[in-house]
Amino acid sequence: MAKTGKVENLIQNAPEKPGVYLFKKGNRPIYIGKAKNLKKRLLQHLKASEYDSKERAIISNSDNLEWIVTRNEYEALVLEIDLIQQYKPRYNVLHKFGGGYPMLLLTKDEYPTIKVVRGTEHEGELFGPFLQSKKAYKVKKLIHNLFKLRTCDPLPKRSEPCMDYHLGLCSAPCCGFVSKEEYELAVSSARALLTGEVAEVLPKLYEKIEEFSKELMFEKCAHIRDQIIALENLAKGQAVSALPFREGDIFYKFGSRLGLLLVRSSKLVSKEIFDLESDEEVEEVILGYYYSNYVPRKVITNFELSEEVKEWIRNRAKGEVEFSGEIPKELKEVLEENLGEGINEEVLKKEFAEKLGMPVPRVIEGFDISHFYGEDIVGSCVVWKGGKMSKKDYRRYKVKTISRIDDYLALEEVLTRRAKRILKGEVEKPDIWLIDGGKGQLNVGIRVKKRTGLDVKVFSLAKEEEIIYTEDGREIRLKENPILYRVFGEIRDEAHRFALSYNRKLREKRYMEDILSKIKGIGEQKKKIIYKNFETLYDFIEAKDEELRRLGINPSLKQEVKKWLS
């Protein structure tokens, strides 16, 4: 373990093994990280400090560097998390969840009650988390009002009930004012309210109300009736807003922000948004969140989690966790709407003026090129208009003039075709062309601009370094300008996604053409029908027979296609 000397020199002597490293100021860590290869990762920190303000602060504020070698990357991950929670370093985001968000705990006692707790190490059933603590306390109060679970802890033996009984918040099991059977039904009803599983408990409540009415216990009848109304209203709400799974957390990365949606009882119950300084922080935020919070049965992300992180989450859950990339469409829209909010217009004006020397543009067009080893070369044009992405203005281009790998020529064709449409007045003139790439792509954009006479500012954005290249030769470190980074990063990522999806669609169509041309009984007319109605051959073979007959296709052709696919 290295203990003395300058940080830069220590980095050069780091081992090429998995482990955890600690940048320290005095005896206190200011940043803790893990790596599969310690030396390689530390050299990345050193290089990034030349242009990234956070990395520069870590290096410049450190006077010592230590590391701990582990047997594998998973051990390094576990150790990293424990050390971050222990030392809470200044530049780590993982520790910033404190003791976790509030949860509701249905205790495991003879007469259970409901409590607001933090963390996951508790005896009983946990519900939540609640990202706003006041909401947890409101639900707790509702449960006491409706089901009168005891409010004292621990359960004392009294001869007279406390004030909460007289306020209608407690059924006073301490005084024997409620039977064990009656109290258990109240607990079941409270659980049903928290889980949304009301079908089983409602018949029991109806039986109880009938029993109380026969015994002329009308006050208890009214109390049970209130419980029934609350649970039936809950069931109605679920029928309208039900999602395709009961419980899950959804993490959605959108530009430089990470959204979190909590789904419980098939309903969206909470949302949270985290601003990220770098892509590396994504997994750190998730690990920090689950260090202190409940892990549900399903975790959904629109990005890939490392196997080490998945393993750690499973171990934290002490049970099965399903990882998925399939986000329900309705929730994706909620996430994008919320993650797109919050751009400070004053800061945006300042960053455009200071860094790019221009006012905030009304229209930005983003471009990218995609191909598959030189085949199906396509280009994308996405449009940012009035502060948000305008999907109705997106356009895709199939490159016609080249048939080999040459991104520059492909880009030149796409930009030229776009410029002609702009100059003809067919589309609104943009203020900026933002091209995914480096200096080479920038030069192509400048060349097309000059040749066509189009009045537009041209920038390119390099993915790895997140650097904007300008026409006057400047290089702007985008991560140092978070609002500009969010806008340009979103446009660049969307252009990349749109180009890639079109490339895949063309490849799939070519694959379909190849298979269908080999099957007897499928002529040109039927091919056109299949292309028009089915995106892939797998969609075709999954289609119902009635649908195929309606399209004039014999369902037996599905079996022929299956043979070729297998």
Curated annotation (Swiss-Prot):
GO terms for biological process: DNA damage response; nucleotide-excision repair; SOS response. Residues 199-234 form the UVR domain. Disulfide bonds: none annotated. InterPro entries: GIY-YIG_endonuc, GIY-YIG_endonuc_sf, GIY-YIG_UvrC_Cho, RuvA_2-like, UVR_dom, UVR_dom_sf, UvrABC_protein_C, UvrC. SMART domains: GIYc (SM00465). Keywords: Cytoplasm, DNA damage, DNA excision, DNA repair, Excision nuclease, SOS response. Transmembrane segments: none annotated. Residues 16-93 form the GIY-YIG domain. The keyword Cytoplasm applies. GO terms for cellular component: cytoplasm; excinuclease repair complex. Its main location: cytoplasm. The keyword DNA repair applies. It is found in: Cytoplasm. Pfam families: GIY-YIG (PF01541), UvrC_RNaseH_dom (PF08459). GO terms for molecular function: DNA binding; excinuclease ABC activity. Gene3D superfamilies: 5' to 3' exonuclease, C-terminal subdomain (1.10.150.20), GIY-YIG endonuclease (3.40.1440.10), UvrC, RNAse H endonuclease domain (3.30.420.340). Belongs to the UvrC family. Interacts with UvrB in an incision complex. PANTHER family: UVRABC SYSTEM PROTEIN C (PTHR30562:SF1), UVRC/OXIDOREDUCTASE (PTHR30562). The UvrABC repair system catalyzes the recognition and processing of DNA lesions. UvrC both incises the 5' and 3' sides of the lesion. The N-terminal half is responsible for the 3' incision and the C-terminal half is responsible for the 5' incision. This is UvrABC system protein C. The lineage of its organism: Bacteria, Pseudomonadati, Aquificota, Aquificia, Aquificales.
